[in-house]
A protein has these predicted regions:
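Phosphate- and other anionic-substrate recognition elements at nucleic-acid/protein interfaces
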Residues: 1-179
């Protein structure tokens, strides 16, 4: 999930410009030959890279500049360490896209995001509904300006909003006004 935003210094709001879900689950027959020769995981990374590059190119053209990409750091079940491999590969794809487009990249952990948006440490494994509820509360408090409905976007795009909000609080570009 991707979330493109800017900070409004006058209103102290994170203004959501766009959200996007990279969906490579639906078949794309343009990649069939490559998949036969190189396997599913390699083609999955190629598709992710192509989609991310298309999105960044389009948004840089539209907004003239993207300064920072905030990436949710890896988390995986330690009982299945091979699950980390595609996550690391996708981070490499993302880093390469950032380098190619002149965008700085930082990472934020899911736990740090959850604490920043107001989920207690005890609920570190909070479900998606808890995250959605807290993001909606930030929208209601006008910390995040989003003209759409959270019901119309994916949980990954909602997470991306939380990750972006967290980094802006860390960088002190937003001041959280609990009310």
């Amino acid at each position: 999930g991707l979330c493109l935003f800017k900070i409004n210094d006058l209103t102290n709001e994170m203004e959501i410009l766009d959200t996007h879900l990279i969906n490579i689950r639906k078949p794309d027959h343009n990649y069939d030959y490559l998949e036969e020769r190189h396997g599913f995981e390699t083609v999955r990374m190629l598709r992710l890279e192509d989609e991310l590059d298309r999105y960044l190119t389009e948004k840089i053209s539209e907004y003239q500049c993207i300064d920072l990409l905030i990436y949710e750091s890896h988390f995986f079940n330690v009982r299945r360490p091979t699950a980390a491999i595609p996550l690391v590969r996708f981070m490499q794809v993302t880093e390469r896209a950032c380098v190619n487009h002149g965008i700085m990249m930082v990472t934020v952990s899911p736990q740090q995001m959850k604490r920043t948006i107001g989920i207690s440490r005890e609920l570190a494994k909070a479900d998606k509904f808890a995250v959605k509820t807290k993001i909606q509360a930030l929208i209601d408090r006008r910390m995040i300006h989003f003209t759409g409905s959270l019901d119309d976007i994916s949980e990954h795009e909602i997470d991306a909003m939380g990750i972006g909000y967290t980094q802006m609080i860390i960088d002190k570009l937003l001041v959280d006004n609990p009310s």
